[in-house]
Amino acid sequence: MAIRCFGLMLALVRCLITLSIALLLQVGPAAAVLNSDSYDGNIYALYAGNGSLVPPASTLEESLAEGRTAVIVYYLDDSAVSKRFAPVVSELQRLWGRSIDLLPLSTDPLQGREALGAGDPATYWSGIIPQVVVIGTDGRVVFDQNGQVPLADINNAISTATGLPAPDLGRIDQEGSFNEVNIEVTAN
């Protein structure tokens, strides 16, 4: 009787293993989709090759207190327009480095709450993504635009805010994928 039970249990285990393997083989690979409003993860790591952008190294309040130029980029991880804009944000970090405080901020925590003053990112958010706000060393808004803002426009606004010459953009194609942008950046 015990041998018969053991044989049945062994057959059942084999059947379950076979079924599990069959189910695993039918699951498709995970894929990030640039042109969908699906959540794929950190958009800067996936679509700009730069996961170091979030969370930002400093806060808006710290930037204002230290008199540094702050560049706020409002985005959502589950937004196709934010995904397409991610390489521009990464390029800003490459161009300006430590000369500015680059603050890519998800708008999720800002939804439906009151702004708490100049040091609160909700103060400057218009409700549309992506949105780029450049705040000068004196705390004044120098630039505020929504949508697929041209890199050259942001670059010029940062130059005005910092008083530093704008870095040359070369021949970077803002509409390309991050791999194309990275290739063009390294080719210059």
Task: Please report, for each region that a protein language model flagged, where it lies by residue.
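N-terminal secretory signal peptides that target proteins for export/translocation
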Residues: 1-10
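Bacterial N-terminal signal peptides
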Residues: 11-26
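N-terminal "domain-start" segment that seeds a small globular fold
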Residues: 29-59
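Short active-site neighborhood of thiol/selenol oxidoreductases, capturing the structured segment around
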Residues: 63-78
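Extracellular/periplasmic catalytic domains that process cell-envelope and extracellular macromolecules
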Residues: 64-66, 97, 124-128
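Typically the conserved alpha-helix immediately C-terminal to a functionally engaged Cys/Sec
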Residues: 81-96
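Thioredoxin-like thiol-disulfide oxidoreductase module
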Residues: 90, 101-142, 151-153, 157-163
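Thiol-/selenol-based redox modules, centered on thioredoxin-like
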Residues: 147-188
